[in-house]
Swiss-Prot record:
Protein name stated in the entry: Ribosome-releasing factor 2, mitochondrial
Taxon lineage: Eukaryota, Metazoa, Ecdysozoa, Arthropoda, Hexapoda
Keyword annotations: GTP-binding, Mitochondrion, Nucleotide-binding, Protein biosynthesis, Transit peptide
One cellular component term from this protein's GO annotations in UniProt: mitochondrion
GO biological process, one term: mitochondrial translation
NCBIfam families: small_GTP (TIGR00231)
HAMAP family found in the cross-reference section: mEF_G_2
Residues noted as binding GTP in the record, renumbered to the chain: 48-55, 112-116, 166-169
GO molecular function: GTP binding; GTPase activity
Ranges for domain tr-type G: 39-318
């Protein structure tokens, strides 16, 4: 490689004196200047596995920036971003929260997101509003199950990221093991920019690889001040030099400008530090590398350098727009990526969160991609609704400070919109279609008010919560006459019940928790349906013929309904108007939401339409109803089977408890994927197991391991049940055992 041929010592000598001997507190008075340049804005999301330290890190950022006057603590329940009563009681983040603060003449808009898998929808929506992310790892645990999940979400949104290895004050923390985890489990290229400094087993600072300096924090001043000192230990100095050479060597193979500068200089002696920093930034924005920093937020070490790295290595909104901008000339949506260039200077924004305030009503959190939002601004949603902005507030969790406007690249809280839903696209231009991906529910249960007189209030509460959280499914069961909730997990549904009680004063009753089974066909099934009726003197008539096939195709709604392309079928189908076909599709897709066995969603199936004849004057709703009736009739005579939800588990346990844990898993129909060492005393077991067998697993695991093992789990698709297990599942679901 290039670097191995050049003079290393001279370059290292140029880097060492870059930092001053003492770095004073960098706390600033917050300034809400709305005219800040887009180049000086950073929109970031904080992502992590549960309990890795997201909220604690956020609290330090707010404190050191001068946005708050005290350090909030999760265990004391006084943090800014965990403001819900349920969050403070449980010590976890449930809803994403937005905060803005200034740091070194830059504006940082930060979203603190949940780490629990039940609230993954909060993370998904937040990522559509940010330009980069900070992934936080627990230094003693490395890459955990939910880390993999949020990393994948960031990949789907094409977000550049930094990694902050937190909790490095713990005795079991291992920075090198975390780097290895990042490389092996996430298939990324981690670039460590720091090394830990410990004294008497305590983390006191970090070694900055680029400047070859030690950064030491003042433990008595809540980490507000820190100083940079030269490295006096020769062996350590050589080790840092080697890390520096490895870094430049890696970057020179990715960045042409840096490689060319090294070749032209024929020596590292004349290569400027800013070229190395530029290469780091460019490679980070292209997602070729992931810079890795370390510290301990709780012990007030390393947070200011993390904030500096957010400014130095994560993109400004204008830089992210180069990723959002697509190459074609027409406005379109590709996943969650908005072609903002099509709209010129017209306003384009996205709703990433809706909350309800008792005094102000619905509060819509909007990320502006283009244009400016002012009081009185009118816009349309991608689905065609019209909205007006009445008031605009600056984000600071659940506090509100009114401002006049906010522009491209910024985040604002808006009062006035009445019908916007989390995930909506907002435009001052032509309508676009935008479909938010909502994960399937894995549990469901009935919900009832304490009296029939409160049913209307309960329905209203559920509508408001569903606006905030589209992953909550609400439907009315015509057979039982009950309202049924679907959620991402037991905790998700418990939080919904708790919010209904604390925020709406309704002591609702949740029924027994049921598993959300899906259903599928064993073999193709064909049927026809003729519906005729006279409504208000007008004759309504529809005839249709279709086959429902088992399929492994995508679950996209467009691909679940296909037309027979034979000449005979096309003769009748070509007479169907596009609007009539739209209502046929609506009825068909609605019918596929309820299977014949347990009323579960039909999965892995495709409808092929052979014939559709619609009488003159037939109303669109009649077509939709006939479509649903035809499919219901076909499914009633079809051979179907149940699909049960599976979970991916990651269990961390001391080695001595491994045998009884594996024995217990085997009784739960679990499939052991891997058993790997973690450190010298622990094992990590990765497992796929049916959700139906995991109802009491956390409690049993604690008992088996005397409280020393931990488990995290996340959905892992569905798999078919054999006849015996299906019969047992149906008996459980019907309350027969």
């Amino acid at each position: 490689m290039l670097c191995n041929r050049l003079h290393k010592a001279a370059f290292a000598a140029r880097l060492r004196p870059r930092l001053p001997a003492t770095v004073a507190s960098c706390r600033q008075v917050h300034n809400s200047d709305g005219t800040i340049s887009e180049k000086r804005i950073r929109n970031i999301g904080i992502l992590a596995h549960i309990d890795a330290g997201k909220t604690t890190t956020t609290e330090r950022m707010l404190y050191y920036s001068g946005r708050t006057d005290m350090l909030g603590e999760v265990k004391l329940g006084n943090t800014v971003t965990d403001f819900l009563q349920q969050e403070r009681e449980r010590g976890i983040t449930i809803c994403s929260a937005a905060v803005s603060f200034n740091w070194k003449e830059y504006r940082i808009n930060l979203l603190d997101t949940p780490g629990h898998i039940d609230f993954t929808m909060e993370v998904e929506q937040s990522l559509g509003a940010v330009d980069g992310t900070v992934i936080i790892l627990d230094g003693s645990a490395g890459v955990e199950a939910q880390t993999v999940t949020v990393w994948g979400q960031a990949d789907r949104h094409r977000l550049p990221r930094l990694v902050f290895v937190n909790k490095m004050d713990k005795e079991s923390a291992d920075f090198d093991a975390c780097l290895e985890d990042l490389e092996k489990k996430l298939s990324t290229v981690p670039v460590p920019l720091q090394m830990p400094i410990k004294e008497a087993g305590k983390l006191v600072g970090v070694i900055d690889v680029l400047s070859a300096s030690q950064i030491i924090w003042d433990s008595k001043g809540k980490g507000r001040s820190y100083k940079a000192i030269p490295i006096s230990d020769e062996q350590l100095h050589d080790q840092v030099q080697e890390k520096l050479y490895e870094l430049i060597d890696l970057l020179s193979g990715m960045d042409d400008n840096l490689a060319q500068a090294i070749i032209e200089a024929n020596s590292l002696e004349n290569v400027k530090l800013n070229l190395v920093l530029d290469a780091l930034r460019n490679c980070t924005l292209k997602q070729q590398i992931v810079p890795v920093l370390l510290g301990s937020s709780y012990k007030n070490v390393g947070v200011q350098l993390l904030m500096d790295s957010v400014l130095n290595f994560l993109p400004a909104p204008s830089e992210r727009n180069q990723i959002y901008d697509l190459t074609n000339s027409q406005a379109r949506i590709e996943g969650d990526f908005i072609n903002v260039s099509t709209f010129r200077n017209d306003f384009v924004g996205k709703v990433f969160k809706v909350t309800h305030d008792k005094q102000r009503g619905p509060i819509t959190m909007i990320r502006a991609f283009r244009g400016t939002v002012k009081k009185g601004s009118k816009f349309i949603t991608a689905t065609g609704g019209s909205e007006t902005i009445q008031r605009i507030y600056e984000p600071l969790a659940d506090e509100y400070r009114e401002i006049e406007s906010f522009g491209a690249g910024n985040i604002g809280l808006c009062a006035g919109p009445k019908s916007t839903v989390t995930g909506d696209l907002l435009l001052l231009a032509s309508k676009l279609g935008l479909q938010t991906t909502i994960p399937d529910a894995v549990y469901f249960c009935s919900i009832e008010p304490p009296s029939s007189g409160q049913q209307s209030a309960l329905d209203n509460a559920l509508r408001e919560i569903q606006r905030e959280d589209p992953s909550l499914r609400v439907r009315y069961d015509e057979v039982t006459g009950q309202t049924v909730l679907g959620g991402m997990g037991q905790l998700h549904l418990e939080i919904v019940k708790s919010r209904i009680l604390t925020e709406y004063r309704i002591d609702a009753d949740l029924g027994p928790l049921q598993i959300a089974y899906k259903e599928t066909l064993d073999e193709p099934c064909r049927g026809e349906w003729r519906a005729e009726k006279e409504i208000a003197g007008s004759k309504q008539s529809v005839y249709m013929d279709m086959t429902i096939h088992p399929s492994t195709a995508s679950e996209s709604n467009e691909e679940r309904i296909v037309l027979d392309n034979s000449a005979e079928a096309q003769e009748t189908l070509k007479l169907v108007r596009p609007r009539q076909m739209t209502f046929f599709r609506k009825g068909a897709l609605a019918a596929l939401q309820r299977g014949p066995k347990l009323g579960g969603q039909l999965a892995n199936c495709t409808i092929k339409l052979h014939a559709l004849t619609i009488g003159k004057g037939t109303a669109d709703p009649f077509i939709m109803a006939a479509s649903a009736q035809c499919i219901g009739n076909i499914l009633a005579n079809a051979r179907c089977r149940l699909l049960e939800p599976d979970m991916f588990l990651e269990i961390v346990t001391p080695s001595e408890y491994l045998p009884p844990i594996l024995a217990d898993l085997s009784r739960r129909r679990a499939r052991i994927e891997d058993v790997a060492p973690r450190g010298s005393a622990n094992k990590v077991v990765t497992v796929i197991a049916p959700l139906a067998e995991l109802g009491d697993y956390s409690t049993v695991l604690r008992t088996i391991s005397s409280g020393t093992a931990s488990v995290s789990m996340e959905p892992n698709g569905h798999s078919p049940l054999n006849e015996s297990d299906e019969a047992q599942a149906m008996r459980r679901a019907l309350g027969l055992e």
